[in-house]
Curated annotation (Swiss-Prot):
<keyword id="KW-1003">Cell membrane</keyword>
<protein>
    <recommendedName>
        <fullName>Putative AgrB-like protein 2</fullName>
        <ecNumber>3.4.-.-</ecNumber>
    </recommendedName>
</protein>
<feature type="transmembrane region" description="Helical">
    <location>
        <begin position="179"/>
        <end position="199"/>
    </location>
</feature>
<keyword id="KW-1133">Transmembrane helix</keyword>
<keyword id="KW-0378">Hydrolase</keyword>
<keyword id="KW-0812">Transmembrane</keyword>
<feature type="transmembrane region" description="Helical">
    <location>
        <begin position="109"/>
        <end position="129"/>
    </location>
</feature>
<keyword id="KW-0472">Membrane</keyword>
<feature type="transmembrane region" description="Helical">
    <location>
        <begin position="83"/>
        <end position="103"/>
    </location>
</feature>
<keyword id="KW-0673">Quorum sensing</keyword>
<dbReference type="GO" id="GO:0006508">
    <property type="term" value="P:proteolysis"/>
</dbReference>
<dbReference type="GO" id="GO:0005886">
    <property type="term" value="C:plasma membrane"/>
</dbReference>
<comment type="function">
    <text>May be involved in the proteolytic processing of a quorum sensing system signal molecule precursor.</text>
</comment>
<comment type="similarity">
    <text>Belongs to the AgrB family.</text>
</comment>
<dbReference type="GO" id="GO:0008233">
    <property type="term" value="F:peptidase activity"/>
</dbReference>
<dbReference type="GO" id="GO:0009372">
    <property type="term" value="P:quorum sensing"/>
</dbReference>
<dbReference type="InterPro" id="IPR006741">
    <property type="entry name" value="AgrB"/>
</dbReference>
Amino acid sequence: MIENISKLIAEKVSSELNYDNERKEIIQYGTYALIQTLISIISVLILGLVFNIALEALIFLFTASILRKYSGGAHSESSNVCTLLGIIISICIGFLIKSSFFAKMNFELVVFIGIVIFVFGYFIVFKFAPVDTKNKPIKTEKKKKRMKKGSLKILTIYLFIEVLSIILYYNSGWSLAKPVMLSIIFGVAWQCMTLTYIGNILLKTIDSFTNKLL
């Protein structure tokens, strides 16, 4: 269905602007990706509001997705399965952060976990990113360097948000500091894991199991 809609939009735009087949394919791919992104965001938002985990689930989703744009990583063979997994994982992480275990966790421990994850994140990104796939090969060294640099910049922005959250917590007792920090921490950890061999094996296993169910 999504593929048909994106194809119709691409054909309409290409016809109006007299684009060749190459440009039409680019428009179709971009439209397809945009629709899937919107489906993910809207689905996570609705389910998050229903279960009162919207903040945590959405921050996790955006954290992992934005970093993924630059760092690459293991993908599901089916883009539809990939979208579904993203929604499910985001909701599960939202529930996890809202659980009594993390709700009762000492703030200093959250800070410590954050330090560990960011050290791990910088190491993994510096060593492995960007990770391409058969469907999305990175063909030039220049692009690889640009994507690695982008990944490190995104990580640094996340680190800045973490530090700012800590400052706000200690200065004004900001009540959302812990869930915001944990959501970013989980997002960074998950995305960086997909850059590793273990993450690749894990996603392939989940992908195989999901395809059997569908």
